[in-house]
Amino acid sequence: PTGGIVCPFGLTFALAENAAKNGVQFRFDTKVTGLHPLDGGGAGWAVETDHGTLETRCIVNAAGVYADTLHNMADAAHPMTITARRGDYFLLDHTAGQHVRHTVFQLPGKYGKGVLVTPTVHGNLLVGPTAIDVDDKEATATTAAGLDEVREKSGLAVKDIPLRQTITSFAGLRAHEARHDFFIGEIAPGFVDCAAIESPGLSSAPAIGAMVADIVRGSLHLHNKPDFDPTRRGILDPKALDLAARAELIRQNPA
């Protein structure tokens, strides 16, 4: 068995940039306030937002901790409940990045895979997370108790973690559903759930994306876009270049 690491933020931006390159439009800071089928069902959806109403042939519900809200608007007869599960992390400086050379997991439990210790693609050391159910779906602040738990449990698998080299701590929320499974499928004509995606959601993301695309393709009788461009030009990191390559960049863009 093999494993690998990736920057989740960089991956997300890369996918979003490629989507925009292929015609996707993003509407940021736009909250869905309601939705209902058009023309009595089967012909699409009206999505009411705080910036007006949108009409669409299909909705893919990938709303994270709020996926239950959208699901229940579309299918109140089969309600879903998403619980926000907070995970606290420590991020350590590059000087601690070689403390471990691969991801060290603990035995998984009822709340997930436990506290891990892993290097990052940027050379830092990442320690966490906890798994604490919270009522507030915006509760991304760390707590003293949560960070104490990370300190204690990480030491069970890796000794002498240099936590004094912590440069920041942070927390994120997982979208937990009581049945402990991903919910992916068309629950109403033109409404596709992609909900309750916990670990290993990141590793599964390419396969989930392909699966959802197949569902939408079948529902709307779509064909592949002939001019789709699968490439994305990465963001150059000057620190990774030698002096000659940096000098060439400066020559090309002296301003």
Whereabouts are the PLM-identified features?
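C-terminal catalytic lobe of FAD-dependent flavoproteins
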Residues: 14, 112, 121-122, 133-255
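Active-site catalytic microenvironments for nucleophilic, acid-base chemistry
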Residues: 18-22, 69, 73, 211, ...
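Helical element adjacent to the flavin cofactor pocket in flavoenzyme catalytic cores
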Residues: 2-38, 42-58
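Hydrophobic (often cysteine-bearing) scaffold residues that line and stabilize catalytic clefts
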Residues: 8, 69, 205
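General beta-strand structural signal in soluble alpha/beta enzymes
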Residues: 26-28, 61, 127, 166-168, ...
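Flavin-dependent oxidoreductases
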Residues: 35-128, 132-143, 152, 158-161, ...
